[in-house]
């Protein structure tokens, strides 16, 4: 059943025309707004009902003001979640509106002048499906109808077997995760949730037997939430999940269990996990999840002087240009990415030759701006007497790759940092006139890292399988060989700038161990060349020779001088892990790769 949100703005409807689109629609498809200096002159909502567009009559004058539209792609599961508006009681008019969906935020349509009262139409966990309000010369009030958002359900992944369990999706988030491992794999999993601000204690799924229990806590009070799960399950008779790892918008848990078996993941870009389901009996057999929209975060610093501007949100940022003089930042110019197309926005003034122009290029989609350092200074002589003397003095940007821009402007002692953990900037807002008087940013969770690929191993069928898994990069390689070929391999990996020592595979020989060390972090491995053949004393082929190629050089040859008959690589990818088969000799070798983003 839909919930009615009372109209905001002028609530005295005497002498005004009331309108009500009702609550019998499924979604909003398009919003059309006309505005002029005095306020919103016309507004129209095109709805979706049973998959078909529905056009309603519209309040206001369709011939006055500048027309702006905001399309909502309901076919891509986009829906309207909230409206922010600015009502001026002096002119009895709504002056500006801004619309937020589960995927993006519109520009501010209209104005947000000093003296205007801000209002919001939204209920957490619900979407807007209808509007009502009143108008005269201008739009005087606006209300809405909302209903629950149906969460996205990802089917359970893992092995077959077990009894079905379902924690449901009526939660706001996850607070604690308990995992117990045993001989066959994970014995049980238990989730604690948050609902209406209260802790909900979940039930264990599986059997509490002997083993180790690990706990991963999520600090929802610090706006931390779960965004993905990765795990491994046995494809054999047991069908049991062997290991599991959880990722929030801020950090990643340790791997709980082992990385043996087939890998799976539960993730939905731009969404957070609010519930789990799956199958379990004596052990945990499979796991699925419910997802809902991840929240945008808006942060801003500065004064309330000058007119507000708000670019809304885009997919990412390609370039930022800052214009400044010796006193303050005069203009902010941004190139946004909107589904592969560049959209430019600029706010402020550019008066050459008195103003300098700085540029910061972002390697989108591989890089996001993650923080903005803003310094504020006071002007002794404001160029606009009616405005405050506090202005933005300088701006400095940092990115997800750890890069820091130049400082644009003259830094002041009053400093603020716009930053949201685990998020990137997807839009800017602020207040500008002659100078920039305030600056803010819209943040959304950084997209998940690209999925790794497992390149098939080359060689013979002998030996037992091994798999080191996937890391960030390779730091060092150890190779031992005998008269027949390669007998021993070991790898040092890097994960989150920490060294991870891989397992020994094979046995060292009297010929010793050779090493190949990469110049981390600038050098990375891009291919492995080798050969395999049948040799005396071995029923299946063994790896005879290996040679490694990086983005900077090629290693020496390890093993015996033979003609290579295989290469392990993928174009535009780097090697981040190894797998294979080992017995008395190395029979197979394969690699894990990730797209190169540096």
From Swiss-Prot:
Q: What InterPro entries is this protein classified in?
A: Jacalin-like_lectin_dom (IPR001229), Jacalin-like_lectin_dom_plant (IPR033734), Jacalin-like_lectin_dom_sf (IPR036404)
The record's section on PROSITE patterns has:
JACALIN_LECTIN (PS51752)
CDD domains per UniProt: Jacalin (cd09612)
> Annotated region Disordered: where?
1-23
- Identify the keywords attached in UniProt to this record, alphabetized: Lectin, Repeat
Question: Could you tell me which residue ranges the Jacalin-type lectin domain spans?
Answer: 2-148, 151-293, 295-445, 452-595
Superkingdom in the source lineage:
Eukaryota
A Gene Ontology molecular function term for this protein is: carbohydrate binding
Q: Does the keyword Repeat apply?
A: yes
One matching Pfam family: Jacalin
Question: What is the designated name of this protein?
Answer: Jacalin-related lectin 17
């Amino acid at each position: 059943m839909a919930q009615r949100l009372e109209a905001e703005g002028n609530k005295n409807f005497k002498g005004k025309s009331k309108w009500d689109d009702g609550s019998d629609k499924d979604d909003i498809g398009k919003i059309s707004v006309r505005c002029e200096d005095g306020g919103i002159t016309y507004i129209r909502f095109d709805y979706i009902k049973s998959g078909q567009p529905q056009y309603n009559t519209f309040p206001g004058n369709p011939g006055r003001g500048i027309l702006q539209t905001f399309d909502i792609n309901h076919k891509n599961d986009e829906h309207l979640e909230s409206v922010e508006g600015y009502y001026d009681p002096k002119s009895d008019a709504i002056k500006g509106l801004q619309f937020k969906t589960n995927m993006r935020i519109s520009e501010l349509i209209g104005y947000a002048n000093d003296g205007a009262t801000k209002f919001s139409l939204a209920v957490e966990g619900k979407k807007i499906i209808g509007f009502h309000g009143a108008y005269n010369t201008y739009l005087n009030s606006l209300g809405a109808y909302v209903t629950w958002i149906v969460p996205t359900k990802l089917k359970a992944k893992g092995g077959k077997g077990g009894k079905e369990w379902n924690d449901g999706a009526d939660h706001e988030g996850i607070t604690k995760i308990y995992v117990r491992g045993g001989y066959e794999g994970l014995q049980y999993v238990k989730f604690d949730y948050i609902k209406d601000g209260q802790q909900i204690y979940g039930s264990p799924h599986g059997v509490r037997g002997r083993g180790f229990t690990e706990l991963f806590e999520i600090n929802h009070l610090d706006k931390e939430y779960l965004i993905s799960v990765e795990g491994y399950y046995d494809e054999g008779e047991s069908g049991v999940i062997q290991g599991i790892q959880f990722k929030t918008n801020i950090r990643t848990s340790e791997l709980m269990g082992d990385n043996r078996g087939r890998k799976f993941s539960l993730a939905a870009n731009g969404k957070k996990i609010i519930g789990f389901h799956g199958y379990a009996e004596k052990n945990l057999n499979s796991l699925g999840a419910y997802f809902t929209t991840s929240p945008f975060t808006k942060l801003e610093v500065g004064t309330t002087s000058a007119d507000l501007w708000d670019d809304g949100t885009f997919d990412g940022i390609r370039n930022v240009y800052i214009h400044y003089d010796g006193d303050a930042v005069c203009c902010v110019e941004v190139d946004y990415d909107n589904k592969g197309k560049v959209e430019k926005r600029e706010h402020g003034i550019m008066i050459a030759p008195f103003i300098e122009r700085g540029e910061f290029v972002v390697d989108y989609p591989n890089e996001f701006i993650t923080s903005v350092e803003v310094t504020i200074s006071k002007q002794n002589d404001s160029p606009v007497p009616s405005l405050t003397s506090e202005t933005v003095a300088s701006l400095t940007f940092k990115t997800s790759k750890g890069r820091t821009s130049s400082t644009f402007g003259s830094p002041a002692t009053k400093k603020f940092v716009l930053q949201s953990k685990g998020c990137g900037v997807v839009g800017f807002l602020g207040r500008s006139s002659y100078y920039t008087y305030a600056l803010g940013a819209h943040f959304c969770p950084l997209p998940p890292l690209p999925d790794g690929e497992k390149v098939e191993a080359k060689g013979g069928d002998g030996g037992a399988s091994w798999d080191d898994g996937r890391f960030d990069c390779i730091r060092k390689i150890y190779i031992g060989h005998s008269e027949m070929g390669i007998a021993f391999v070991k790898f040092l990996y890097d994960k989150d700038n920490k060294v991870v020592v891989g397992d020994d595979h094979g046995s060292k020989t009297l010929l010793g161990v050779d090493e190949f060390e990469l110049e981390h972090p600038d050098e990375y491995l891009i291919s492995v060349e080798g050969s395999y053949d049948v040799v005396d004393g071995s029923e299946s082929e063994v790896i005879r020779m290996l040679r490694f190629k990086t983005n900077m050089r090629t290693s020496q040859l390890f093993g015996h001088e033979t003609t290579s008959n295989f290469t392990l690589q993928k174009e535009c990818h780097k090697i981040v892990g190894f797998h294979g088969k080992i017995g008395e000799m190395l029979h197979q070798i394969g690699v894990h790769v990730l797209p190169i983003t540096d």
